[in-house]
Curated annotation (Swiss-Prot):
This is L-rhamnose mutarotase. InterPro entries: Dimeric_a/b-barrel, L-rhamnose_mutarotase, Rham/fucose_mutarotase. Pfam families: rhaM. Keywords: Carbohydrate metabolism, Cytoplasm, Isomerase, Rhamnose metabolism. It comes from Lachnoclostridium phytofermentans (strain ATCC 700394 / DSM 18823 / ISDg) (Clostridium phytofermentans). Homodimer. Substrate binds at Y18, Y41, W76, W77.
Length: 104
């Protein structure tokens, strides 16, 4: 199992909308996340800076990387592009975080 953490940037004033969209996460998006080996997916928000911190556990990182090629992922990115920083392909601007400690 691989633990991944990352940060993303939410636009000012979009916290409630971001949370709403994730509370209503499409069933096919949930299925895709599990199909590609993702679990224990959690996103936190720093309300002072609008920085999102994500954490996910993966069965296989190479398999997970293929989620970006799925139509449902591309559709989700387009859906979220108006409320957060994105790359030209609508994927969220995401910065990987270094794991410096873990305790089971």
């Amino acid at each position: 199992m691989v633990r991944k953490a990352f940060k993303m940037q939410l636009f000012e004033g979009q916290a409630k909308e971001y949370e709403k969209r994730h509370n209503e996460l499409w069933p096919e998006m949930k299925e895709m996340i599990h199909e590609y080996g993702g679990s224990n997916y959690t996103i936190f928000l720093d309300e002072e800076t609008n920085v999102l911190y994500g954490y996910i556990e993966l069965e296989d990182e190479e398999k997970w990387d293929k989620t970006a090629e799925t139509e449902i992922c591309k559709k989700w990115w387009a859906f979220m592009a108006d409320i957060m920083e994105t790359n030209p392909d609508n994927s969220p601007v995401s910065v990987s975080l270094k794991n410096v400690f873990h305790l089971d």
